[in-house]
Amino acid sequence: MSKPKRERSLAENEAKAVARMLRVSPQKLNLVAQLIRGRKAAAALADLQFSRKRIAVDVKKCLESAIANAENNHDLDVDDLVVAQAFVGNGLVMKRFAARGRGRSGRVYKPFSQLTIIVRQVEAEAAAA
């Protein structure tokens, strides 16, 4: 016996991928996520390829995973995919200390983030508009 299947939270023309434990602050990750929101998947991949941000490599990997999920798991056409949503969440925060003057210490926060990308298949006419 197994658990009953859970209802699919996405529409039939959508697929998603989640990247967790990304070692960057959510604020910096959101700058890169804003680049790809609402863009066609191929254009978003090209933008990430030539972005100078360090975290763009991990965002590109997550987007490629979402595209692969759409193609292999949900039988969607890769050429008609659009980045419907790209949102950032908080992860854990490692707390470290740095030595300061006069024998004191200061806190250093090392934040982690998570990224969720949802791609949606749209018709060719709607994507061109």
Swiss-Prot record:
InterPro entries: Ribosomal_uL22, Ribosomal_uL22_bac/chlpt-type, Ribosomal_uL22_bac/org-type, Ribosomal_uL22_sf. Keywords: Ribonucleoprotein, Ribosomal protein, RNA-binding, rRNA-binding. GO terms for biological process: translation. GO terms for cellular component: cytosolic large ribosomal subunit. One of its GO terms (molecular function) is rRNA binding. The keyword Ribonucleoprotein applies. Signal peptide: none annotated. It comes from the Bacteria. Pfam families: Ribosomal_L22. Transmembrane segments: none annotated. The keyword rRNA-binding applies. Belongs to the universal ribosomal protein uL22 family. This protein binds specifically to 23S rRNA; its binding is stimulated by other ribosomal proteins, e.g. L4, L17, and L20. It is important during the early stages of 50S assembly. It makes multiple contacts with different domains of the 23S rRNA in the assembled 50S subunit and ribosome. The globular domain of the protein is located near the polypeptide exit tunnel on the outside of the subunit, while an extended beta-hairpin is found that lines the wall of the exit tunnel in the center of the 70S ribosome. Part of the 50S ribosomal subunit. This is Large ribosomal subunit protein uL22. It comes from Bradyrhizobium diazoefficiens (strain JCM 10833 / BCRC 13528 / IAM 13628 / NBRC 14792 / USDA 110).
